[in-house]
Structure formats: structure tokens, C-alpha cells
Amino acid sequence: MDTKSFKRTLQQSDNYNRKGFGHKEEVMDAMTNEYQSDLIQEIRENNYRLQRGDVTIYLAQAFGFCWGVERAVAMAYETRQHFPQERIWITNEIIHNPSVNQRLRSMAVGFIPVENGQKDFTVVESGDVVILPAFGASVSEMQILNDKGCMIVDTTCPWVSKVWNSVEKHKKSDHTSIIHGKYNHEETIATSSFAGTYLIVLNLDQANYVANYILHGGDKNEFLEKFKNAHSQGFDPDRDLDYIGIANQTTMLKSETEEIGKLFEHTMLRKYGPIDFKDHFMSFNTICDATQERQDAIFELVKEPLSLMVVIGGYNSSNTTHLQEIAIERAIPSYHIDSAERILPGNRIEHKPLGDDLIITDNWLNEGKIVVGVTSGASTPDKVVEEVIEKIFAFKSSLVPG
């Protein structure tokens, strides 16, 4: 399918909007009241530090709502204001933050139901309004909604759209797209739908496996089993790795994405030589600025003498998980929570370790003076960060020494 042509036709339709409806000022006032925080602004103005009693907070210098997230949420608010009576749906969570998604539900925005792992679009009728979230939506979903005669409000982050353009270039030049991402993440599902032939690698270990296969060959059945949920239909590693281009899920760990890109560049250079390798390899520049800034900020934060780290964001948020990884790699006790409600009485905290289910840890705040590093994912409002910080102050001051 010519996805580029379909996208162009859709964007020229009267039933498509990606610029909002002219209610930006009113919407931003509402979002400021609901999501911004005077306390967080105070901490910013105090060199990203705040001390009360025995607790000193060190806040990362880049954290929380990114421009793409703020834009998506604002467009969703505008959509409800512009269509006060119409049925409004969204194809997925607008962003990976439970409080924001719950706010949309309170505004009577319906979430497309999922049955046996498949979205049930039969609930959508002609004339309904359907929001595409910040992660985007697959080509097939857009086709379904377009065929139904829906008003489509597209809040896809421009950085995600940039990746789509990259994989479409790969497809046009008959290159396989190697996508650094999570095959079941909404963004990567959407990106792969715009690609031709593709392979999704989760991490550097998987990338090294593929690079070794490119250079030395291997067991095709083993390869296909290893990547059974992460490649295009009919993918053949013996045929489809001669010409490759690199793309990424925008929320992956920047350093790993860059390392994977360099790995494949060196692999193709080694296999095809300096004259021909450029025909076989397409480089990329699709690392999201906001993701990079937040990761750079936590790399700086973990240099401080921290007692512990609190990382705030949705548990299904990829960019938040990678912030957690950075702290753990520095051997800093780190707690990933999605709201202040996870901080429990009795010096207990309910949190999500990397790759594991929620657990409760006792005595997580040490006695005496402590320095707490705080950061949050790109989908986390400042108001949520404020609530977490205030609860840390309150619970620490209530602890009885001894």
C-alpha cells in the first residue's frame, strides 16, 4: 500500500484535523489550573532544589510534560469543547498517564474497547469524532475510521510522524527498516504499519544477534523464532537484510539507539566495503529532543549525592522506564511510582521494579537527613510531581526516630 499517498489524501479531507479548533487560549487556562504547579515553579527558580526539615529534593532540570504531550492533551480538550454534544472516542490512551486519561473519561471521551487483544471499532459510527493519541495510530486503524466517515482529530506527536517519514523512505528505496523499539508498544505498531519490510529489535543484544547474522549467516528458523512477533509478514533474514535503514521508537534510551545505529553502520561497512555500503545502509536522525533532554538531565542528576531516586510516570510509559534504568545503573535505590497514592503510611511505598510487578517496600525513607532525586516521564503533569514531593515531606517529618 502507498501509505504516503493515503496519508496525504486523509490530511486533505474535511474530516481530518491536526491543528486544533481555535480554542487554544481557553484550553491552556484549564490545563494550567489542572496540571501546573506553583511549588514546582518555585523549585525551578531555586536551582531545582528544595529543602524542608531533613529532606532535600533535587529535581532533574528537564522532566515532565514535553511539547508533544502538552499539544496532544490540549487538542483533546479542544475537541470536547468544539464538539460538546457529539460522541468522542480515542483509539488508545492519549498519553501514558493514568490521571490524564481519567480526566478525559470524566469529559465523556470514550476509549475504543479491546476484545481478545483487538480493538473493536464497531462501536464507532459515522459522524462520531475520533482522537488519535500522541503515539499515533496504525494505517489500518486510520483506514477504518476514514471509511466510517468519522471526524479524525490527529494529535500524533510530530517527532513520531518524522519516524514514519523515515520508514517510508526506506520502503521507497527497498530497504528493510530496522526499528529500535518494543514490538507491542502503540508507537512502534503505528510506525511499522508505515514501513514496508521491517524488523523490530528491543535492545543491543538483539541488535548484535542481527548484525552477526548479516555478517555470518545462521539458522533462519532460529532467527524467525527469536523475532516471531517483531517482523513484517514474509520476512526472510537471508533476503531482507542486504539493504537496511534504521528507525526508532522515540521514547527508547537515546544512548542505546545511537549505539544500535552505529553497530549496523559498521556492520554494513564491514560487509560491503566503503564504496558500496552507502547503497546498503540508510542512517537516521529520529531521536526525540524531549526524550534526549530528560535522559541527559537524569544523567546529570545521578552525579549528585542522592540517598534515593523517585521516578514518576505511568507504568506503561517507555520513556519513564528508561529514566528508571539510568538511576538503577548507578546503584541508586530507585522507586518508580505513577502517583502520590503509592506512598503509603508507615514508611512504605508501592512501586514497580524494572521488569517486575508492583511490590511494597518498607522503611524506604531512611532516618536522618536524606537527599531525594526526583524526575518524571514526559507524560507526567507537574501537579502530580508536586503531590509526590509534598507527601515525601509530610511522611518524613512524621517518622519517629529510633
UniProtKB/Swiss-Prot annotation:
Catalytic site: 187 (proton donor)
Reactions the enzyme catalyzes: isopentenyl diphosphate + 2 oxidized [2Fe-2S]-[ferredoxin] + H2O = (2E)-4-hydroxy-3-methylbut-2-enyl diphosphate + 2 reduced [2Fe-2S]-[ferredoxin] + 2 H(+); dimethylallyl diphosphate + 2 oxidized [2Fe-2S]-[ferredoxin] + H2O = (2E)-4-hydroxy-3-methylbut-2-enyl diphosphate + 2 reduced [2Fe-2S]-[ferredoxin] + 2 H(+)
Ligand binding ((2E)-4-hydroxy-3-methylbut-2-enyl diphosphate): 96, 185, 250, 317-319, 379
Protein's pathway: Isoprenoid biosynthesis; dimethylallyl diphosphate biosynthesis; dimethylallyl diphosphate from (2E)-4-hydroxy-3-methylbutenyl diphosphate: step 1/1; Isoprenoid biosynthesis; isopentenyl diphosphate biosynthesis via DXP pathway; isopentenyl diphosphate from 1-deoxy-D-xylulose 5-phosphate: step 6/6
Pfam families: LYTB (PF02401)
EC primary class: oxidoreductase
GO molecular function terms attached to this record: 4 iron, 4 sulfur cluster binding; 4-hydroxy-3-methylbut-2-enyl diphosphate reductase activity; metal ion binding
Cofactor note: Binds 1 [4Fe-4S] cluster per subunit.
Binding site for isopentenyl diphosphate: 96, 185, 317-319, 379
EC number, as in UniProt: 1.17.7.4
Cofactor(s) listed: [4Fe-4S] cluster
GO BP: dimethylallyl diphosphate biosynthetic process; isopentenyl diphosphate biosynthetic process, methylerythritol 4-phosphate pathway; terpenoid biosynthetic process
Keywords: 4Fe-4S, Iron, Iron-sulfur, Isoprene biosynthesis, Metal-binding, Oxidoreductase
Binding site for [4Fe-4S] cluster: 66, 157, 288
Residues noted as binding dimethylallyl diphosphate in the record, renumbered to the chain: 96, 185, 317-319, 379
Family per record: Belongs to the IspH family.
Role: Catalyzes the conversion of 1-hydroxy-2-methyl-2-(E)-butenyl 4-diphosphate (HMBPP) into a mixture of isopentenyl diphosphate (IPP) and dimethylallyl diphosphate (DMAPP). Acts in the terminal step of the DOXP/MEP pathway for isoprenoid precursor biosynthesis.
Protein name, UniProt field: 4-hydroxy-3-methylbut-2-enyl diphosphate reductase
Organism (species): Microcystis aeruginosa (strain NIES-843 / IAM M-2473)
Gene label: ispH
